[in-house]
Amino acid sequence: MSQEKKVFKTEWAGRSLTIETGQLAKQANGAVLVRYGDTVVLSTATASKEPRDGDFFPLTVNYEEKMYAAGKIPGGFKKREGRPGDEATLTARLIDRPIRPLFPKGYRHDVQIMNIVLSADPDCSPEMAAMIGSSMALSVSDIPFQGPIAGVNVGYIDGKYVINPSVADKEISRLDLEVAGHKDAVNMVEAGASEITESEMLEAIFFGHEEIKRLVAFQQEIIDHIQPIKQEFVPVERDEDLVEKVKSLTEDKGLKDTVLTFDKQQRDENLDALKEEVVGHFLDEEDPENETLVKEVYAILNDLIKEEVRRLIADEKIRPDGRKVDEIRPLESEVGLLPRAHGSGLFTRGQTQALSVLTLGALGDYQLIDGLGPEVEKRFMHHYNFPNFSVGETGPVRAPGRREIGHGALGERALRYIIPDTQDFPYTIRIVSEVLESNGSSSQASICGSTLALMDAGVPIKAPVAGIAMGLVTRDDSYTILTDIQGMEDALGDMDFKVAGTKDGITAIQMDIKIDGLTREVIEEALEQARQGRLAIMDHMLHTIEQPREELSAYAPKVVTMSINPDKIRDVIGPGGKKINEIIDETGVKLDIEQDGTIFIGAVDQAMINRAKEIIEDITREAEVGQVYHAKVKRIEKYGAFVELFPGKDALLHISQISQERINKVEDVLKIGDTIEVKITEIDKQGRVNASHKVLEQSKN
């Protein structure tokens, strides 16, 4: 890497973009400092000197948000950053996906991309700056990389597409799209949307690609100026004689029939048996541990299986389980499985099954997101779990990994736009999707199961959402798009294109590919085929439950909304929270108070809600001239008695207003604790209340 500082400048969405090389992190294979507005990101690329054994590419992308970048000190006891949060993990995945397909086939060196956010301007996306930084760090390094790539954020506001919208613009945008690619094609898409049509989404993707091409050209100018020298990488060539021998054996053993097995587990067993039988022909009894040859034969077998699956799909239009290319697996769904849960939905598609369980909580049960931007209170959460038994395997039980976090977030994005507003449904909602079986498209099954759970719980959603995963197999100059891909098609195909939405439009998409990129024609066809599949799945779901239930579960908390004068909020809370804690201790309710005086009272027991409401009404009640109260004598003075109209509000009952008859001493008529009927006669400018019992006597007479 060059040791001399060089600075390159351009503009990006109306803000300055600067890329610096040669000054920082010079021991990395490649490093750049990206300045986008006031956002500053350091991106580095490092590769191991020796390749790793195995048949996968060991790429790791990290994205670290330093709290000092936003002028914050981390919370917690240690006051330092811990493991990356969900948002940072999602950004790392976002960067990984467009970069991964652009390394040479067979490259097995460990590659680590590090992105450290040093300064964060929320209106100048650190995530998109890190994507460009990752591309440039690889491009100026000696690591083989067939980039550069770039990514942009696209919004859709008042019928117009916007590149890298500001935080304020995102609040009113119908679309939050991240798209990445190189100069020739798009190779990554991630979006959440408010029922965007397929044509609107397609236009947004390629509107973003036009800006990507400009950013890629800018990066190419930097690369041409620096002229990095790349490592020489020569992929390992297969022994052609060995390949032909293994191929002949697989044909003799019936590879085609083995692949065309409906049941996933039976297919896996048949393929394992075929592999063992073929490998057995190459085992040397005198050298039974000839690992190199055995590994080579296994690798060839995997290549042949992949090629056969792709050939069957591309040439014969036959899928491993016998389906047509646009056919959806058998569907089953059910709601209300769990009597004590607030809502539940079971969705099964072929050998993929997700159980989604919904819990309703008070608004105060929100999740607080404290990142580089302003704190966010999240009141809708979707979590995704993928246990080992779902694929018939054993293994350690760990905390959610990147994949689980990513799939949970995708489901959350797909459903976020149908969740009712707080004013219409004052609850925090958490859905947990447990994948019980998996043979591909489990994230989309979790979206369908979650929609069922929402409707079972009685959540007044704006519209039901269904999800489907599309696949792609390219062969020579032709391509085949697959509807509802299973695990083998995902693993051996070229694309995993997930699309979720309502009958009227898309609410989320996510596209991962293993080839260089996709043309407009392929994406357009995939979106239309996905729409047809999505509508078919939704039709099935609506036969299970047509609309949200009219009543919530008996075990769900009930929430009552009331409004008070904002000036009275401090009276409800009390000094140091004393009053509100007394209410909570007495009734067991959860109270959430908004700045405008809206109060949400939540509890399972309606009687306790009513009691809490009564207490708050007493605290915040305003005395009115002309109103009659049964007041209690609290204090006696020479000039009259102070009576409590209701908790927190006293009035002066002057001695002259106690009776029609003349009274010498208040104590002759009243004592502390007595109850007396009084009428409010005056409230002065200072809020002091005067009452009279005499006027009531006069009116009776």
Swiss-Prot record:
SMART domains: KH, S1
Single Gene Ontology BP annotation: RNA processing
Intracellular or extracellular location(s): Cytoplasm
Domain of life: Bacteria
Span of domain S1 motif: 626-694
E.C. number: 2.7.7.8
Binding-site residues, Mg(2+): 490, 496
Reactions the enzyme catalyzes: RNA(n+1) + phosphate = RNA(n) + a ribonucleoside 5'-diphosphate
The family this protein is said to belong to: Belongs to the polyribonucleotide nucleotidyltransferase family.
Role according to the record: Involved in mRNA degradation. Catalyzes the phosphorolysis of single-stranded polyribonucleotides processively in the 3'- to 5'-direction.
The protein's name in its UniProt record: Polyribonucleotide nucleotidyltransferase
Gene encoding the protein: pnp
